[in-house]
């Protein structure tokens, strides 16, 4: 075995050759540079940001959001788009389902005039467009809605009864191999919305599975299972849903945490409702009977009145949010564009 000095010299020569051939930084020691905190895009729900462990969806990664129909998958994705845009970012939406409602997106805070939208004809076209946008380096977030609607060209051009086993799975596998590296270099967050199917003949365990094969399960850094658990009513009139999200996979923080929040019809995720829930849980907001109080000030009788009070007094909501994030250690929220210095983006 060569002497330690000779090994170090040989390694330095190899690293110099790699830098010359492939560019500086192609290989580096993790301890050479101080790694900044993971940049994130807030989800619009403080409870979900807390469950994710880092304050939002990680940038430069693949995120999968799946669940039953009308559970709130697209709503969560659109809130993330709105958060990215508010921080000055550029967003794209690949509408493979041809079902995007611009009016609803605008109500959630999405700048629909600036949103890049594509309604592709085939799955290949959708993923090629996504790849080109990601490789431009200008994008902060891209949403593909949905994986189930990414129909391969061969299936579209074939007859209705033809068998096309594994085509979509191969398409997704090839696409994810291409775009994962590009996402990391560009700092773009890619959200894949997915649907549920049931496997036939399952005797034990859950028969539920997602479409598009197994590649997305492997490449995703975060997987969110979105479920509607309750209908919110004003008297007898339904006004929204209580939604539970389980973080079933998380490569950037401990997984399996859960978040619950309210989605109000026509308004999206209730930020104020989330602040009240977490405020009560962590002792910042006091609940006595039906009354909610904060620092001796009454917020209202009943959650709806307290929610309305915080909506009318946004500074108070910001104060509660700041205290919650400081206590839970998720204050280092990096939701500004990637080119901004890390020190400028930290908000405690």
Curated annotation (Swiss-Prot):
Compartment(s) where it occurs, according to its Swiss-Prot or TrEMBL record: Cytoplasm
Transmembrane region(s): none
Gene Ontology molecular function, alphabetical: ATP binding; ATP hydrolysis activity; ATP-dependent DNA damage sensor activity; damaged DNA binding; single-stranded DNA binding
Swiss-Prot/TrEMBL keywords: ATP-binding, Cytoplasm, DNA damage, DNA recombination, DNA repair, DNA-binding, Nucleotide-binding, SOS response
Biological process terms in GO annotation: DNA recombination; DNA repair; SOS response
Gene3D superfamilies to which the protein is assigned, alphabetical: P-loop containing nucleotide triphosphate hydrolases
SUPFAM superfamilies: P-loop containing nucleoside triphosphate hydrolases, RecA protein, C-terminal domain
Key word Secreted present: no
Residues at which ATP binds: 67-74
Entry keyword Nucleotide-binding: yes
InterPro entries registered for this protein in UniProt: AAA+_ATPase, DNA_recomb/repair_RecA, DNA_recomb/repair_RecA_CS, P-loop_NTPase, RecA-like_C, RecA-like_N, RecA_ATP-bd, RecA_C_sf
Main location (coarse class): cytoplasm
Cellular component, GO annotation: cytosol
Similarity field: Belongs to the RecA family.
Biological function: Can catalyze the hydrolysis of ATP in the presence of single-stranded DNA, the ATP-dependent uptake of single-stranded DNA by duplex DNA, and the ATP-dependent hybridization of homologous single-stranded DNAs. It interacts with LexA causing its activation and leading to its autocatalytic cleavage.
Protein name (record): Protein RecA
Lineage: Bacteria, Bacillati, Actinomycetota, Actinomycetes, Kineosporiales
């Amino acid at each position: 075995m060569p002497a330690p000095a000779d090994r170090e010299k040989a390694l330095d020569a190899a690293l110099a050759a790699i830098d010359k051939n492939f560019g500086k930084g192609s290989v580096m020691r993790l301890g050479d540079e101080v790694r900044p905190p993971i940049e994130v895009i807030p989800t619009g729900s403080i409870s979900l940001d807390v469950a994710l462990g880092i304050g939002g969806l990680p940038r430069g990664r693949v995120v999968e959001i799946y669940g039953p129909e009308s559970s709130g998958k697209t709503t969560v994705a659109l809130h993330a788009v709105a958060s990215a845009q508010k921080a000055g970012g550029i967003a794209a939406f690949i509408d493979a389902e041809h079902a995007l409602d611009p009016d609803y997106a605008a109500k959630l805070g999405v700048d629909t005039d600036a949103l890049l939208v594509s309604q592709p004809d085939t799955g290949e076209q959708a993923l090629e467009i996504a790849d080109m946008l990601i490789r431009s380096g200008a994008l902060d977030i891209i949403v593909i809605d949905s994986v189930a609607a990414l129909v391969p060209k061969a299936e579209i051009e074939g007859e209705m009864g033809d068998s096309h086993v594994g085509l979509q799975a191969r398409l997704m596998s090839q696409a994810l191999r291409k775009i994962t590296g590009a996402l990391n270099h560009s700092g773009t967050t890619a959200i894949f919305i997915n649907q549920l199917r049931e496997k036939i003949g399952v005797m034990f365990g859950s028969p539920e599975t997602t479409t598009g094969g197994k590649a997305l399960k492997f490449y995703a850094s975060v997987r969110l299972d979105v479920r509607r658990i309750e209908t919110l009513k004003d008297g007898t009139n339904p006004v929204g849903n209580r939604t539970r999200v389980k973080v079933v996979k998380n490569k950037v923080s401990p997984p399996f945490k859960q978040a619950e929040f309210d989605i109000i019809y026509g308004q999206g995720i209730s930020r104020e409702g989330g602040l009240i829930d977490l405020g009560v849980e962590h002792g910042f907001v006091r609940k006595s009977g039906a009354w909610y109080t904060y620092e001796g000030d009454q917020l209202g009788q009943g959650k709806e009145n307290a929610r309305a009070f915080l909506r009318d007094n946004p500074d108070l909501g910001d104060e509660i949010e700041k205290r919650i994030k400081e206590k839970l250690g998720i204050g280092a929220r990096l939701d500004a564009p990637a080119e901004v210095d890390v020190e400028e983006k930290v908000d405690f």
